[in-house]
């Protein structure tokens, strides 16, 4: 089915960023925003080659004149036409490959609706004519990337956060928890609390500036109340940031108030458990015999786990919830921003995986539903 010399393509479609590259590589070649932009204004310069839509970095750089849309919301594809544009851009512009010559490994959110998975399969075979494809669950790939087959993955990206317990390579669906609170919500919250400080950020373009502030300056406090005290009495926690127009803004307690929402969703007006409690609840839904292995192998993954201080805080919070003698270990690999992609790269290059691909022939015989039989 697969010639040894043809590298498989690995595409991790996140709500915020798309990561793509070749199986066997240790990092994705292309990382670009999962954005499709359409002009807000009529083009007036004839012959400038203005397009009716822009994808990724190009959409990002022309954001001032475009309306930006994210086709993946909360980890699940909501706009298939735009998604197709993103895949087209991935293959032809970013990786510069012909998809009909390579097997493609795609990733999906845990608990992805069945119809979504079928639609992905259909587009790959019918629109892009791939010779073979596979759909893998993101959290499972993150665990592979950490060199484990058992553990619980707390995966938090831009659109959604999941806690996924995995035992001997199988995700335990009954214990998967989903929290619709992730990077994009934190960016929106930071926009809101910066507005209270008197800075105004409203447009989709300005939101990207705030996202940058979040990524560069925010951190998780080990003790939130204590940190608030420190911030109110001294200026030691203040940092400044230069906006694109040269204006400099100062931020203080917003630096840790923003990511604190992951532990206290009530900050966003949400009646949900924080990431520590969600992780604990997930573990408690598993068989009592495997909990010990999960506590000792709690793996963080995704861009929203990149805040400094998050691992220590998780350790502290889960220790407080768990039985007193339990050994708790939080694993935060430095490359966790891309661990889903790295796990996909590892999986797709394993010799034992080669018979797992769904081939074009199998698809033609069975149709899109083949994906439920072959990918689990």
Curated annotation (Swiss-Prot):
Record PTM Tele-methylhistidine, positions in chain: 74
Modified residues (N-acetylaspartate): 3
Chain positions found as Methionine (R)-sulfoxide: 45, 48
Gene3D superfamilies in alphabetical order: 3.30.420.40, Actin, Chain A, domain 4
Domain of life where this protein originates: Eukaryota
GO cellular component: cytoplasm; cytoskeleton
Post-translational modification N-acetylcysteine, affected residues: 2
InterPro entries cross-referenced by the UniProt entry: Actin (IPR004000), Actin/actin-like_CS (IPR020902), Actin_CS (IPR004001), ATPase_NBD (IPR043129)
Alphabetic keyword roster: Acetylation, ATP-binding, Cytoplasm, Cytoskeleton, Hydrolase, Methylation, Nucleotide-binding, Oxidation
CDD domains: ASKHA_NBD_actin
GO terms for MF: ATP binding; hydrolase activity
Reactions that this protein is recorded to catalyse: ATP + H2O = ADP + phosphate + H(+)
Post-translational modification: Oxidation of Met-45 and Met-48 by MICALs (MICAL1, MICAL2 or MICAL3) to form methionine sulfoxide promotes actin filament depolymerization. MICAL1 and MICAL2 produce the (R)-S-oxide form. The (R)-S-oxide form is reverted by MSRB1 and MSRB2, which promotes actin repolymerization. Monomethylation at Lys-85 (K85me1) regulates actin-myosin interaction and actomyosin-dependent processes. Demethylation by ALKBH4 is required for maintaining actomyosin dynamics supporting normal cleavage furrow ingression during cytokinesis and cell migration.
Matching SMART domains: ACTIN (SM00268)
Cellular location(s): Cytoplasm, Cytoskeleton
Modified residues (N6-methyllysine): 85
Principal location listed in the UniProt entry: cytoplasm
PANTHER family: ACTIN (PTHR11937)
Family to which the UniProt record says this protein belongs: Belongs to the actin family.
Role played: Actins are highly conserved proteins that are involved in various types of cell motility and are ubiquitously expressed in all eukaryotic cells.
Record's protein name: Actin, cytoplasmic
Organism in which the protein naturally occurs: Biomphalaria alexandrina
């Amino acid at each position: 089915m697969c010639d040894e010399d043809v590298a498989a393509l690995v595409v991790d479609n996140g709500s915020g960023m798309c990561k793509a590259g070749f199986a066997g590589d240790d990092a994705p070649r292309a990382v670009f925003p999962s954005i499709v932009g359409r002009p807000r204004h009529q083009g007036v310069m004839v012959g400038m080659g203005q397009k009716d839509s822009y994808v990724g970095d190009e959409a990002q750089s022309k954001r001032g004149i475009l309306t930006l849309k994210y086709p993946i919301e909360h980890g699940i594809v909501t706009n298939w036409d735009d998604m197709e544009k993103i895949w087209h851009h991935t293959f032809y512009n970013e990786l510069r490959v012909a998809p009909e010559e390579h097997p493609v490994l795609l990733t999906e959110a845990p608990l992805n609706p069945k119809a979504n998975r079928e639609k992905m399969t259909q587009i790959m075979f019918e629109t892009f004519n791939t010779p073979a494809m596979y759909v893998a669950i993101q959290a499972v790939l993150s665990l592979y990337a950490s060199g484990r087959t058992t553990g619980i993955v707390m995966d938090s990206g831009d659109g959604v956060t999941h806690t996924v317990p995995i035992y001997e390579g199988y995700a335990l669906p009954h214990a998967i928890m989903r929290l619709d609170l992730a990077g994009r919500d934190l960016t929106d919250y930071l926009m809101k609390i910066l507005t209270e400080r008197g800075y105004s950020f409203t447009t989709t373009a300005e939101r990207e500036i705030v996202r940058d502030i979040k990524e560069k300056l925010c951190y998780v406090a080990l003790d939130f109340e204590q940190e608030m005290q420190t911030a109110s009495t001294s200026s030691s926690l203040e940092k400044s940031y230069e906006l694109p127009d040269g204006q400099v803004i100062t931020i203080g307690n917003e630096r840790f108030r923003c990511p604190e929402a992951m532990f206290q969703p009530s900050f966003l007006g949400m009646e949900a458990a924080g990431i520590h409690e969600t992780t604990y609840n997930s573990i408690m839904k598993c068989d009592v015999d495997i909990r010990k292995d999960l506590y000792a192998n709690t793996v963080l993954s995704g861009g929203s786990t990149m805040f400094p201080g998050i691992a220590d805080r998780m350790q502290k919070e889960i220790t407080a919830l768990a039985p007193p003698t339990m050994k708790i270990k939080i694993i935060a690999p430095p490359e966790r921003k891309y661990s889903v992609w790295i796990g996909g790269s590892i999986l797709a290059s394993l010799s034992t995986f080669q018979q797992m691909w769904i081939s074009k022939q199998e698809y033609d015989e069975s149709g899109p539903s083949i994906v439920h039989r072959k990918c689990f």
